[in-house]
A protein has these predicted regions:
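Alpha-helix capping and helix-coil boundary motifs
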Residues: 3-4, 32-36, 99, 131
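Long alpha-helical scaffolds in very large eukaryotic tether/adaptor proteins
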Residues: 11-25
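Cytosolic nucleotide-binding catalytic cores of signal-transduction proteins
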Residues: 45-47, 51-142
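Cytosolic signal-transmission helices at domain junctions
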Residues: 1-13
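Histidine phosphotransfer helical core of two-component systems
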Residues: 21-57
């Protein structure tokens, strides 16, 4: 329980830091709109690296998914052999319930490609005999 509290608190702290920075950039009165957009893009890219893409940040997200989604990523890693770590990262984002456009941004992919990958993964799981098949199907149906 204490571990859940620590991870959840850290997640909210990071989220509010992100929101606060974006609001600050957007509300600057004496800056041209094009400069604001460049600043916001730069800041979101930095935040992506700091909070979502780095290994430490990702391990924290995976722990949260395991805590709140019935140990889904641990089961998935044991049961399913994927090509590389980025595939597991994408699955974790799916299991966490991230919107498709957010996953595309995080993975530097086109939105259509993320939809296709999720569809192929759903078909693969549907035709499998994994012990936690129902859990995976539920998490991918969001």
């Amino acid at each position: 329980l204490e571990q859940k509290k620590v991870y959840t608190t850290e997640l909210f702290k990071n989220w509010f830091e992100v929101v606060g920075t974006l609001v600050f950039l957007a509300e600057q009165k004496d800056v041209k709109e094009s400069s604001k957009l460049k600043s916001i893009r730069k800041e979101t890219d930095l935040m992506k690296e700091k909070y979502m893409v780095g290994n430490k940040a990702f391990r924290g997200l995976e722990r949260l998914v395991n805590m709140y989604q019935d140990d889904a990523m641990n089961h998935f890693r044991r049961e399913v052999s994927l090509a590389d770590e980025s595939d597991y990262r994408r699955v974790c984002y799916f299991f966490a319930g991230f919107p498709i456009h957010t996953i595309a941004w995080l993975m530097d992919e086109k939105v259509e490609n993320v939809y296709q990958r999720r569809l192929r993964l759903r078909k693969f799981i549907a035709s499998s005999a994994f012990a936690h098949k129902e859990l995976y199907e539920r998490l991918l149906s969001k």
